[in-house]
């Protein structure tokens, strides 16, 4: 993903019919407002899509509706945010994520109880619900990201901070998933710290394209000093580095190497 668009999250509001549905409506409203304020798009079920209302997911049937919506927006969704206004019901949530099979990062957020609001209309019990949801994700082999605190108010400043951090995680994960990395030359014998397994990288979707150093050097030496791309590279380097005049010839060599390497990248994208 090359910052191609405004980031978009699939949003799941988990609930359980035993709890007051108004809690879920409030969380939905505040979460979507925060996403919009922070500059993100979102995909979420309509408020009347499930029996519990407020886009909330409880049963497997609810989860399948959400999974269908997420699959239809596969190309848009960069990550999934699960919010628990109350204990929630793990079955609906895990089916939504597993059946959608988007293979994107997942953030799990839960709301905490207020000490003076633990009656039937106000109790949340999302602390335990989050443990259940995360345990299911673990069982299904679905990686997930936790919030700064296990639970907090949906009105907390931590919400925006956690969403922005999660967005960065999504950019890295999705950006590397199909990355192609050029490996120029062999590893120096004295630097075992930079050893890496191409097979392990490939298992994560990262492909390594090796090239002999002599090929890049040969291509660099063929570049004329008057080459327009070379002159642009020299200008670029001088904009961020101060190079003494006596080293100007070395700078030209460095720039040629950069141009040759850049052309190799373009040829193997």
Segments the model singles out, each with a brief description of its role:
Residues 1-174, 178-268:
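Metallocofactor- and cofactor-centric catalytic cores in central/energy metabolism, strongly enriched
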């Amino acid at each position: 993903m090359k910052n191609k668009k405004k980031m978009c999250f699939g949003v799941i509001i988990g609930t359980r019919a035993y709890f007051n549905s108004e809690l879920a409506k409030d969380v939905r409203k505040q979460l979507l407002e925060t996403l919009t304020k922070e500059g993100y798009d979102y995909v979420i079920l309509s408020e009347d899509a499930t029996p519990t209302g407020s886009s909330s997911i409880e049963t497997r049937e609810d989860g399948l509706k959400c999974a269908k919506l997420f699959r239809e927006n596969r190309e848009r969704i960069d990550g999934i945010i699960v919010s628990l206004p109350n204990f929630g019901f793990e079955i609906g949530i895990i089916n939504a994520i597993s059946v959608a099979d988007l293979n994107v990062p997942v953030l799990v957020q839960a709301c905490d109880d207020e000490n003076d609001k633990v009656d039937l209309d106000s109790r949340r019990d999302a602390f335990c619900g989050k443990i259940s949801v995360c345990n299911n994700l673990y069982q299904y082999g679905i990686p997930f990201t936790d919030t700064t605190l296990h639970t907090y108010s949906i009105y907390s400043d931590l919400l925006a901070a956690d969403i922005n951090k999660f967005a960065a995680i999504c950019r890295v994960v999705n950006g590397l998933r199909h990355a192609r990395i050029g490996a120029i030359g062999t590893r120096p014998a004295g630097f075992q710290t930079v050893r890496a397994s191409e097979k392990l990288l490939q298992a994560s979707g990262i492909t390594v394209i090796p090239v002999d150093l002599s090929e890049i050097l040969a291509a660099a030496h063929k570049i004329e000093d008057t080459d327009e791309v070379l002159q642009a590279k020299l200008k670029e380097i001088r904009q961020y580095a101060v190079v003494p005049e006596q080293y100007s010839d070395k700078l030209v060599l460095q720039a040629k190497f950069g141009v040759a390497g850049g052309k190799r990248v373009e040829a193997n994208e």
